[in-house]
């Protein structure tokens, strides 16, 4: 456990604590509990706050449970996708919910575990957050039709040469299926000489998003979060696709006028805002945090305060 404490660094921890500083009591939902770093820090600072922690990775949840032992009786941990579980928690607790945290990053535990297939040197081709899920990266890479690969590389990886890469993968797998993440990473490296970013980065991102339905889950969550009252919502994203969804959702929440944009005159009374955006620009890690934890460098945090 001491090893986990030293290796796992919660991204933007002080900024998250500051975002939830106004909370004194009620329920905070950590939609992506992971190893429990953010939750542990929040519970330590807020003795009257209770926690609902959600994660689809049962192994990570066991570690989080051990780390939260000192707060026995103040938390409840749920397994499953965060959009579905959040909706259930909202229906059950409603006005008790005062804070919601979503950290969309892959945990260090998952990234560093070679059996999970998230890193370029992994001797597995998996990428599942939920190990009980049927779809994994090997099925996507070795079985998806070329047109489906093109779509996920274009939509989820924003890869310019999405057609070329999809066809090259199809040609190679016809001769010899990809056996693990390292095999795929090495193959992708042979196709590109890009020095700024590892050639496999965007393909791995696209496949991981597909395997875990990450963007669909985020969309579902953001739609459900509209029903929050007098709560602080804090979302940490790690790539432009996630951040765009969060940014646009927050803008939508803050709209006073809900008339058709083509209308010449407002007829809706112009008072429909669900609250206010507390971060006009996303909060990003300090140079010091990036130096201590390179994986934090792409993090962006946005915060919204819902009205009563």
From Swiss-Prot:
<dbReference type="GO" id="GO:0071424">
    <property type="term" value="F:rRNA (cytosine-N4-)-methyltransferase activity"/>
</dbReference>
<keyword id="KW-0489">Methyltransferase</keyword>
<feature type="binding site">
    <location>
        <position position="103"/>
    </location>
    <ligand>
        <name>S-adenosyl-L-methionine</name>
    </ligand>
</feature>
<dbReference type="GO" id="GO:0070475">
    <property type="term" value="P:rRNA base methylation"/>
</dbReference>
<comment type="function">
    <text>Specifically methylates the N4 position of cytidine in position 1402 (C1402) of 16S rRNA.</text>
</comment>
<feature type="binding site">
    <location>
        <position position="55"/>
    </location>
    <ligand>
        <name>S-adenosyl-L-methionine</name>
    </ligand>
</feature>
<dbReference type="InterPro" id="IPR002903">
    <property type="entry name" value="RsmH"/>
</dbReference>
<feature type="binding site">
    <location>
        <position position="110"/>
    </location>
    <ligand>
        <name>S-adenosyl-L-methionine</name>
    </ligand>
</feature>
<dbReference type="InterPro" id="IPR029063">
    <property type="entry name" value="SAM-dependent_MTases_sf"/>
</dbReference>
<protein>
    <recommendedName>
        <fullName>Ribosomal RNA small subunit methyltransferase H</fullName>
        <ecNumber>2.1.1.199</ecNumber>
    </recommendedName>
</protein>
<feature type="binding site">
    <location>
        <begin position="36"/>
        <end position="38"/>
    </location>
    <ligand>
        <name>S-adenosyl-L-methionine</name>
    </ligand>
</feature>
<comment type="similarity">
    <text>Belongs to the methyltransferase superfamily. RsmH family.</text>
</comment>
<dbReference type="InterPro" id="IPR023397">
    <property type="entry name" value="SAM-dep_MeTrfase_MraW_recog"/>
</dbReference>
<feature type="binding site">
    <location>
        <position position="86"/>
    </location>
    <ligand>
        <name>S-adenosyl-L-methionine</name>
    </ligand>
</feature>
<dbReference type="Pfam" id="PF01795">
    <property type="entry name" value="Methyltransf_5"/>
</dbReference>
<keyword id="KW-0698">rRNA processing</keyword>
<keyword id="KW-0949">S-adenosyl-L-methionine</keyword>
<dbReference type="GO" id="GO:0005737">
    <property type="term" value="C:cytoplasm"/>
</dbReference>
<keyword id="KW-0808">Transferase</keyword>
<keyword id="KW-0963">Cytoplasm</keyword>
């Amino acid at each position: 456990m001491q090893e986990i404490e030293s290796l796992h660094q919660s991204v933007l921890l002080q900024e998250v604590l500051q975002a939830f500083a106004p909370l004194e009591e009620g329920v905070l939902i950590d939609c992506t509990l992971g190893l429990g770093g953010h939750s542990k820090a929040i519970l330590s600072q807020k003795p009257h706050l209770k926690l609902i922690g959600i994660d689809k990775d049962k192994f990570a949840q066991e570690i989080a449970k051990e780390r939260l032992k000192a707060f026995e009786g103040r938390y409840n941990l749920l397994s499953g996708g965060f959009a579905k579980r959040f909706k259930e928690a909202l229906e059950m607790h409603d006005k008790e919910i005062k804070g919601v945290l979503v950290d969309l990053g892959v945990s260090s535990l998952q990234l560093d575990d070679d059996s999970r297939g998230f890193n370029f040197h992994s001797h597995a081709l998996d990428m599942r957050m939920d190990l009980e899920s049927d779809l994994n990266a090997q099925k996507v890479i070795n079985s998806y039709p070329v047109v489906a690969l093109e779509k996920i590389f274009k939509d989820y990886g924003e890869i310019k040469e999405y057609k070329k890469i999809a066809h090259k993968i199809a040609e190679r797998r016809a001769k010899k299926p990809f056996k693990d993440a390292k095999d795929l990473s090495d193959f992708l490296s042979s196709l590109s000489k890009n020095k700024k970013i590892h050639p496999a980065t965007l393909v791995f991102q696209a496949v991981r998003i597909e395997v875990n339905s990450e963007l669909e889950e985020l969309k579902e969550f953001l739609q459900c979060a509209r029903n929050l009252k007098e709560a602080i919502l804090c979302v940490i994203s790690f790539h432009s696709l996630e951040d765009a969804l969060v940014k646009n959702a927050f803008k939508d929440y803050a709209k006073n006028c809900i008339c058709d944009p083509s209308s010449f005159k407002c007829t809706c009374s112009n008072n429909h805002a669900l609250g206010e955006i507390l971060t006009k620009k996303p909060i990003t890690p300090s140079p010091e945090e990036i130096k201590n934890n390179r994986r934090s460098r792409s993090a962006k945090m946005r915060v919204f305060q819902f009205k009563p």
